[in-house]
């Protein structure tokens, strides 16, 4: 895996500059935003653009500022959306996407898919409505579907596996796998739990939240420290750990150091605008 500038997929695989002649990368993720809990001075809140051959562009989470960042990389009218949960920093740029899909001069044809927790339609409809107590019916622009824990969802050439994780609201980690076996696991927001380790088992890339530094006084079932993110990566035997969801008030350097103390593979804290190519290891 390597980071480099994004370019348009056009349904093709990517030559990987760091692996060898003829090797291709089939999954590409661009960090639209990675600031934890709130929009940061240098990054929107959570949002990640995922592209793969024979698959429509997907956005994992849609927090504050993500719609603006998305416009630098893809047509917002072309994307489908996968929401891990409905806390504001993961979904509240969605009303802006409602406006884009309804009122752009070249309005998108058909509906986009929107996957999320059970009350996605009601919660986002309330946020988008101009009147208190009313729901903006988004069924004209989105086909809203709900995650079911452990039930895989095919999207284009990819398979998405949602698993409930430990967070105060209904929250899912997602495992995305392509036909070659390349796998990305996104933790969403979670505290330490067995489901997260199970979901991440053997993943090529583990995009994992690390919202704070480690302390025994941290509340359970809310977020991970750098120590806990690194420990989960080690327990799951992932190939590479990408840390995300670090709030502006948390030291990135301390979180990275904590994770490295627990996990001996590559560790990197992502920044907005980075692009990563993901590939399964070559099989002998």
Curated annotation (Swiss-Prot):
Gene3D superfamilies membership: Ribonuclease Z/Hydroxyacylglutathione hydrolase-like
InterPro entries: cyc_nuc_deg_phdiest, Metallo-B-lactamas, RibonucZ/Hydroxyglut_hydro
Stored CDD domains: RNaseZ_short-form-like_MBL-fold
Molecular function terms from GO: 3'-tRNA processing endoribonuclease activity
Pfam families, per database record: Lactamase_B_2
Highest taxon above the source species: Bacteria
Cysteine disulfide partners in this protein: none
Family named by the database record: Belongs to the AtsA family.
Protein name as it appears in the record: Uncharacterized protein ML1173
């Amino acid at each position: 895996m390597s980071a480099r500038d994004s370019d348009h997929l056009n349904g093709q695989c990517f030559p990987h500059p760091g692996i060898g002649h003829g090797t291709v990368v089939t999954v590409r993720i661009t960090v639209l935003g990675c600031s934890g809990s709130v929009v940061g001075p240098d990054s929107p809140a959570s949002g990640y653009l995922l592209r793969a051959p024979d698959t429509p562009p997907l956005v994992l989470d849609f927090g504050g500022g993500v719609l603006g960042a998305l416009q630098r990389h893809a047509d917002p009218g072309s994307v489908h959306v996968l929401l891990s949960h409905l806390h504001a920093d993961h979904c509240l740029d969605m009303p802006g996407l409602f406006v884009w899909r309804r009122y752009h001069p070249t309005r998108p044809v058909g509906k986009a898919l929107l996957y999320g927790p059970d009350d996605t339609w009601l919660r986002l409809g309330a946020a988008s409505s101009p009147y208190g107590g009313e729901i903006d019916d988004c069924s004209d622009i989105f086909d809203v579907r709900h995650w079911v824990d452990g039930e895989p969802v095919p999207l284009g050439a990819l398979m998405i596996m949602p698993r409930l994780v430990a967070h105060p609201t209904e929250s899912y980690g997602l495992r995305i796998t392509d036909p070659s076996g390349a796998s990305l696991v996104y933790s969403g927001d979670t505290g330490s739990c067995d489901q997260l380790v199970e979901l991440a088992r053997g993943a090529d890339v583990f995009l994992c939240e690390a919202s704070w530094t480690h302390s025994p006084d941290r509340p359970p079932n809310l977020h991970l420290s750098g120590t806990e993110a690194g420990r989960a990566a080690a327990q799951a035997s992932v190939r590479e750990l990408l840390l995300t969801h670090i709030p502006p008030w948390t030291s990135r350097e301390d979180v990275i150091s904590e994770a490295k103390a627990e996990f001996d593979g590559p560790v990197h804290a992502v920044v907005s605008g980075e692009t990563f190519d993901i590939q399964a290891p070559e099989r002998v």
